[in-house]
Amino acid sequence: MSVIKRLPRYYRFLGELKKNNITRISSKELSQRMGLTASQIRQDLNCFGGFGQQGYGYNVEQLQNEIGTILGVQNGFKTILFGCGNLGRAIASHMTFEDRGFELVGLFDSNADKMKDIRIKGLSVYPVEDLEVYCKEVEPKVAVLCVPTEAAPAIVERLVNLGITNFWNFSHYDIASNYPGVTVENVHLNDSLMTLSYQIMNREEQAD
């Protein structure tokens, strides 16, 4: 699982190399850019067959394409988003879903009646009451939750009953514990911020 967590980072770094017209790179050079060891990179990539050539290194475009295939960026999973407040709008507006294997097809909010004139990436905001009809017609596969934690349980229950079992979860609701068969990627921004706090304190202590 830790290898899978690193693959999107490889994909992103390789994309930046392509933008800078770098066509090949050694594991040592890649390790210096990413803050990993060269042996870790070789070990990670060997889990999927290995893609480098001794004495040549890695073809940047080919390696990014291979990693993209492993991650499924070609899939275009139909995705709906719940909660069009500040966080939900930012994610819907600025995330490049289509470049990451997803197609954002629908937006839902409990206050959709107040958002009739709002379009986010060309999408209207639907009321939650339309969920069942919408899902039967469109058949989305993934749900993004940008709702308050207290609102999440009822929404998740409805989604699971409709056959949606894949979640990108920005709420603090523990979906996996309540629905063991689902696939969940939790995003806890507060955890990330506290990790930064620790790193700052640790660096300052070492500097003293």
Which positions does each model-derived feature cover?
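Phosphate-bearing ligand-interacting subdomains
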Residues: 15-19, 121-208
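HTH-adjacent hinge/linker in prokaryotic transcriptional regulators
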Residues: 24, 28, 33-77
